[in-house]
Amino acid sequence: FGLTTATVYLSRFPGDKVGDDNAIPVSVVLLPDFSGMTQQQRLNPPAVELSATELTIPPIEEKAKKKLTVIVTNVGKSDLEITDLQVFNPALGVQLKKRVLKPGAKTKMKITAYGKYLNKVKGTPRVLMITNDPNCPKVIIKVNVTAK
């Protein structure tokens, strides 16, 4: 499960050089298959809830880093498993205390933005979380941040 990325390079003429100006990044997110769930599992699913799905950080210096915390809660009726946790680019780092949450349990997800990589980011930095919640298997947290 999770994020798979590749870069496709386009050319108009034979012999065109490969570079950032003719590169197209392609991303695919593979999600878990819930078709084999039993009736009991369907009636008592885990449910993920986040304290925030979009974070805003003021512009940071190139040599600086900024940490934020998101609280992940299981509001469902069975164990929530966080099977994959990935960032879309190197400008972010992510840490998670626990990957399995009992019903009602919480854990902290620490997201770090690194200033030295922000100038190379195209688009909005994001964190991808894959869970066994059949109603929300893919959670994306957007981090609005720029370099100073």
What are these regions (language model features)?
Residues F1-L10, D21-A23, E62-T69, K116-L128:
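Short, solvent-exposed loop/turn segments enriched in Ser/Thr/Gly
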Residues G15, P58, L96-L101, Y114:
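Beta-strand-rich interaction surfaces with strong enrichment in secreted/lumenal proteins
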Residues M109-Y117:
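Short, hydrophobic beta-strand segments
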